[in-house]
Amino acid sequence: MARVKRAVNAHKKRRSILKASRGYRGQRSRLYRKAKEQQLHSLNYAYRDRRARKGEFRKLWIARINAAARLNDITYNRLIQGLKAAGVEVDRKNLADIAISDPAAFTALVDVARAALPEDVNAPSGEAA
């Protein structure tokens, strides 16, 4: 069986790893083994954080909606409850955008939600205090 010489392939692979690891700090950008380890970690972090980003944006939208809702004397929880009761299907991303860019429209949505809410949520059903 013929001997396999891997010089070209090995150098090509090392060169591509070192090229991808430019910008890393210290040995991680210069030594192949350190660069390879760092690249594995970097790709894992990128994969994980692409998924985490979705939750972070949702938290941001909720914080913005809550801040705008409290300016209209209603809590985020009651606003969402009222919008669902009124049958308004606006997702949190668009609701946050409306809250920032068009406060008058957001106030109109708050009024719709307030009208759809029952008078006293804490009272037993059928008895308004």
UniProtKB/Swiss-Prot annotation:
InterPro entries: Ribosomal_bL20, RIBOSOMAL_L20_CS, Ribosomal_protein_bL20_C. One of its GO terms (molecular function) is structural constituent of ribosome. Keywords: Ribonucleoprotein, Ribosomal protein, RNA-binding, rRNA-binding. Pfam families: Ribosomal_L20. GO terms for cellular component: ribonucleoprotein complex; ribosome. GO terms for biological process: ribosomal large subunit assembly; translation. Binds directly to 23S ribosomal RNA and is necessary for the in vitro assembly process of the 50S ribosomal subunit. It is not involved in the protein synthesizing functions of that subunit. Belongs to the bacterial ribosomal protein bL20 family. This is Large ribosomal subunit protein bL20. It comes from Mycobacterium tuberculosis (strain ATCC 25177 / H37Ra).
